[in-house]
Each structure stands twice: as C-alpha cells, then as structure tokens.
Amino acid sequence: MAALMNGFGSLQCKATVHVEKGHMQASGMAFFSPVNRCAQVHISSIPHFIGAKSVSASQLRMRHKVGSIRASAASCLQDETTKYFDFVVIGSGVAGLRYALEVSKYGSVAIITKAEPHESNTNYAQGGVSAVLCPSDSVESHMQDTIVAGAYLCDEETVRVVCTEGPERVKELIAMGASFDHGEDGRLHLAREGGHSHNRIVHSADMTGREIERALLQAVDNDDNISLFGHHFAIDLLTCQSNGEIYCYGVDSLDAETQKAIRFISKVTLLASGGVGHIYPSTTNPPVATGDGIAMSHRAQAVISNMEFVQFHPTALSDEGLPIKPATRRENAFLITEAVRGDGGILYNQSMERFMTSYDDRAELAPRDVVARSIDDQLKKRGEKYVLLDISHKPREKVLAHFPNIAAECLRHGLDITQQPIPVVPAAHYMCGGVRAGLQGETNVKGLYVAGEVACTGLHGANRLASNSLLEALVFARRAVQPSIDHMVDADVDPSFAKKWARPVLSVSLRDSILSDIIEKTKQARMELQSIMWEYVGIVRSTNRLKHAEWKISDLESEWEEFLFRRGWKPTMVGVETCEMRNLFCCAKLVVKSALARHESRGLHFTEDFPYLEESKRKPTVIFPTHIQELTWSSKPLQKQLQCK
C-alpha cells in the first residue's frame, strides 16, 4: 500500500526510513524473505527539490589532494568471488565512465556493467549535448527553456548549476578526444531541437552518444587504475545501519559468463545504471534498461522521486510503416532524433495533413510531452498506427550529412528519407524520476552516489528538455567526485566485511529443463507486464486505469512467483532473467504508485480525471521506504540488517 502524506522529509529522512537495528543486509539480495518493505508516497510540500545544502562551484574544487593511489591495501585482497576497491561504479554510460576517470586519480576503481561496456543508453543517444556555447545564447535562456519544458517542476538551483557548468564539461569531453561536428567557419556546429529557443546542441551527426562513449571507453582503457567487469549483473547493494544512518559498502553481482556470484566491497559506490524503458513493450532503450539501479536503491532504503514522469519520445521509427519490414522484432525501437524536427521536419497524419499547429503554437518544436500526446491523439482519433515525419523538402546533401545513421537504417528497409516521409510513433524513452539526489549526487544512503538517468536531481522536473540528459550526466558525474573522495578517505572498510552478508545462491543448481521452464515463464511475464503498462500507464492515464494496472501487476507478479516456487526456486536464488523481472516489477509498481499520488496533469503525467495543472500541486513526488507492509518479493531484503561494526 502507499499513503499520500503531507509535509517534507529531508534527504536523510531520519524520521521516515525505518530499519530494524542490529542487522545487516544485502539490500534485497534474494527474493523471498519473510521481511516485507513498502513505499510510502508523498507530494513534497516545499518547492525546493532537495533538502540538501547548496555547494558552490568554488567549493566543488578539490579541497585536499589525496594523491595518486595505484591500488589501496584493501583492493589487493582479491579472491575468486570477492573483490575490494576504493570505488565501485555500476554502469558504463557517460555518467559512470566520466566519474571513474576522475576518481581513479585517488584510488582503485571497478566499473561493473551488465553487458558489453558500450551497451548503454549513452551509446544510443543521437541528438547531442545541450550547452551555452554561442555568444547570442545565455545561461538564463537555457534555464528558462529547461524550466518551461519541465512544466515548472524543476529545481531552479539544480537547473542553474547544470546550465552554468555544462559548457566546461563539454570542453572537457573535447579535450579527452570526443569529436563533434563543426561548421564551415571551423566552430562547433550547434543544432536546435524541440523546446530550445537557441541553437545549442553539440553533436556528432546523429550518433553523438556513440562518439562520446567511444572517447570515454578509450580513456578508461588507458587508465591502469580502472578495472572494467563486463557481463556482471548487479544483484543488490550491500548495506548496513549505524546510528540511524544507512551505509553502502558495495554490491553483489552475477558474472553471466562464468555463472559465479562476485561480491564487490568498496568504500564508495556510484550508481549510473540508466533507466527503466523495458517496463514498456516499445522503447528506444537498449535491452539492459530494466530499472536495476532504481529497484536496488529502493530495496536499499534509498528515497525515490518523480517516478510518474516517464518520457515517451514522439518519434521512434514505426516498423509497421516501412516498405520492407524487419525480419525479426527489434529488441528496442529505432530512435528518430529530435534534431530532425529541429532541422525543419514536419509531422503529418497519413492523409498528409499537418497537425501540430492545431495543438501548440510551437508546432513541431514543442517539448516532447506535447508532441507525444498530440501524436497519440491523432492515432486514436484516426485509428492509425503511425504518423509521418517529413524532412524531404530539405536539401539532400544536408539531410544525409546531418542524419547519416537514420538515412542508412531507413534505406535498409526500402525508404529514402530524402524523398519520402518517415513513419514514426511514440515509444518509452527516458525516466525523469529516479533515486533522489542532492547537488553532489549524494543520496540518503551514505557512500552511495547516483548520476545519469538513474538519478532524480530535479533538473528535468515533469519533462526532460531535449539533449539535457547527457549534459546532466556529465555535470553530476563531476560534482560527485569530491564528496566521494572525502567519504573514501574517511571510510573504514575491514576485509572481514565480505563475510557479513549472506551469499546469493545460483540457479544453475536446478535441472536444465526446470531452468528452461522458468526462463520461458519469465519471458511471458515480462511481455504481460509491458502490455499492462502500455495499456493502463501510457501517455494518457486515468485513476481507474491506474488502479486496474496496480492489481493486474500484483496478480501477475504473484502468479509468476508461485510458478517459480513450484518449480523448485529457492528464496536466495538469483539468475539474470529473474533478477531483471524482479526489478521490472518493482519499477512498474513505483511508477503506478507515483502516478496515483499526483492529482493533476503536469508534463509527462496526463490524467483524464485531473486534466489541468494546479499550482498548489507543483511539488515533487517522493517515495520513502517505511514500515513493514504486505508486498511481494520485489521489495523484500534477504535478511535483516546488521549493525555496522
């Protein structure tokens, strides 16, 4: 159950997080514990997003130099199933890599990623990085665009920090070898996208994320103090309690290649694991985006915020409208970047009637939430499956130069974008909510920092402005460095810590036939969950549909859980497919609970029962962990917490 509360809890939420003293947990590491925890939902009663102390740019500079440490004493004490590092980074997108490259100057670093290192949301980002780099532009203008797009729910201090520090972070990327497009005058070519009042998007054709990922991975590869662990699935954070505070000391993981459980003990953990796109059937996110970081953090007693604000990108490629259909169903939808509309692309229905001018004065350059709802309305009214995005009126050379990846993908399926409109449809794209973070990426769990899509910093408010995601990741990855170093210096991690948490049990002990049945059942449950989310928790919502989704998700999860038990699944077992399913259930429930708590329509959350924006409700949604309640195992820890010794 979730209760709607009044009042505000600080970032530390000492009075709101209830943990049984005298215990330590691998926070929810395995599934079916006798202990249940649930979320308490409240709409924060003060407009400022984070109850954390502001830190100026000058304060952010290194207050003391620890010195270059090739490997700490603890990091040398490795064995086959336990590894010790000063810093553990979960995720290999722009946020995780950029952070790792900074903290590696002060200690040993492990980067854990669940697939190949390049397989992140960053790698699929087409548009670019927004930054004020033109004399005619200003930080104030970028701030205003961000706040308007965010439906005035953005935290103004966070917005100012990001818009002010962004240009320097972009320059650092260039210095590290990232190559961006330049104009004929030799200066950076700055594109314009929906919601922006100026040209301020730094880009590398329509493959910006890929170029940034390439440059950062190359730098990581050249850094001897960073160890990268691919195909390591993060299971749960290792946490304990001391003096009313919760501390994080690393993470348990599953090496998918060796099928061994690997424990990473660390002084500092940065969570940069990306979003939750795969709670929906169609998403631009890669298959790794299953909400692992948010779900782990929720089980670890971290505060979660603004989960109702799921951004649907207005223009994903519609395979239904292609002349040559793909041979197999895509794992993730192919994104048609915002920059196509920014470059003059026009949206039509299938009767070639331009429709955006009927919905918003900004037409195709309106923010994403407006465009996605407009397309959704057209599709429902006309009974069609896609609309058309036309850029063919622009010079062929310009189109091919700016959008080579899109042009090539469409041509593979028989469509020439220089002559024909592109069939597009909205798809789940970005989670504006996540783990609640302060101005330095800090969470209410000591030693746990967050950056990138997994975090909710207050920048995006109720809707993210185009190309602000990579920007936010860069800024907060850098801002988390100094407090991480300070915590690392002060932290006392005894090697014996590794023995304090129970180890997960691998599912390989089950017979192959049983495992096959479980994996097949899990695939079915995943598809059913995605269908429920799209039908009842999509672009347009209602209270009845949200409540319907709530009980359908609960029933589906219980049915799946019971099937696993009948087939011999044990309470402490882990497997990649089942852990992902667990996290998907958890995140889906958080989205629904948050959506039910917001009794207005704002930004990405539009509900027919409360169709108007209300000033009195201009507050973030905050989910606090609270007393034991009756929930399924998505929120259950394996064991009670131990007192930190």
Swiss-Prot record:
What Gene Ontology terms for biological process does this UniProt record contain?
Answer: NAD biosynthetic process
Q: Does the keyword rRNA processing apply?
A: no
- What InterPro entries does this protein's entry cite? FAD-dep_OxRdtase_2_FAD-bd, FAD/NAD-bd_sf, Fum_R/Succ_DH_flav-like_C_sf, Fum_Rdtase/Succ_DH_flav-like_C, NadB, Succ_DH/fumarate_Rdtase_cat_sf
- The enzyme class is oxidoreductase
What is the annotated localization of this protein? Answer: Plastid, Chloroplast
Sorted alphabetically, the Gene Ontology cellular component annotations on this record are: chloroplast
Which GO molecular function terms does the record list? L-aspartate oxidase activity; nucleotide binding
* Transit peptide limits: 1-70
In this chain's numbering, which residues are marked as the site (Important in orienting the L-aspartate substrate)?
E193
Superkingdom: Eukaryota
What Gene3D superfamilies does this protein map onto?
FAD/NAD(P)-binding domain, Fumarate reductase/succinate dehydrogenase flavoprotein-like, C-terminal domain, Succinate dehydrogenase/fumarate reductase flavoprotein, catalytic domain
What does the record note about the cofactor?
A: Binds 1 FAD per subunit.
Describe the reaction catalysed, as an equation: L-aspartate + O2 = iminosuccinate + H2O2
Q: Which UniProt keywords apply?
A: Chloroplast, FAD, Flavoprotein, Nucleotide-binding, Oxidoreductase, Plastid, Pyridine nucleotide biosynthesis, Transit peptide
| Function per UniProt | Catalyzes the oxidation of L-aspartate to iminoaspartate.
Q: Which protein family is it in?
A: Belongs to the FAD-dependent oxidoreductase 2 family. NadB subfamily.
Q: What is this protein called?
A: L-aspartate oxidase, chloroplastic
Per the UniProt record, the source organism is Oryza sativa subsp. japonica
Source organism lineage?
Answer: Eukaryota, Viridiplantae, Streptophyta, Embryophyta, Tracheophyta
